[in-house]
Amino acid sequence: MSLNLNDKKAVVAEISAKVASAQTIVVAEYRGIQVGHLTQLRAKARDQGVYLRVLKNTLARRAVEGTAFASLASEMTGPLIYSISDDAVAAAKVISDFSKTNDKLVVKAGNYAGKPLDKAAVTALANIPSREVLLAQVLGMMLVPVASFTRGLAALAAKKAEGAEPVAAAAPAAESTEAAAE
């Protein structure tokens, strides 16, 4: 389907708006993927909050022109699907995970916060846990000293309680031995 000039301007404006708020863009070649698989990829992307779209490369180049993602323009050749995300790892994770199960989807390049990424860097970015998981891990690490301190206090209290009973029991025995000695 051919787009007229107004349609092209609308597409560039839409993509430019997405790119302006994005942290990560991942570009993948989708040559030979069946429509059903592409639909599954779109559903996974939608669930993760990732904007996924097949675009004309010239329109995509115009959309990233003058942004931190301009370095991707040199990689925009061939049939590409663009994955754009506000989350740092979501776009890379969706594309990378899907490419593991479908060898026809090939990660070509990416860009994170203005830094160009090659295929290996996109895969490494995809292996980073999500923001929520990282926050949970940090919180868990912060709670470890508190939990250790609490267990230490409980053990100390238990030890003192055990130590107090034998001393209290030994005191009447000592009194009885003193009374017997007199």
Curated annotation (Swiss-Prot):
InterPro entries: Ribosomal_uL10, Ribosomal_uL10-like_sf, Ribosomal_uL10_bac, Ribosomal_uL10_bac_type, Ribosomal_uL10_CS_bac. GO terms for molecular function: large ribosomal subunit rRNA binding; structural constituent of ribosome. Pfam families: Ribosomal_L10. GO terms for cellular component: large ribosomal subunit. Keywords: Ribonucleoprotein, Ribosomal protein, RNA-binding, rRNA-binding. Part of the ribosomal stalk of the 50S ribosomal subunit. The N-terminus interacts with L11 and the large rRNA to form the base of the stalk. The C-terminus forms an elongated spine to which L12 dimers bind in a sequential fashion forming a multimeric L10(L12)X complex. This is Large ribosomal subunit protein uL10.
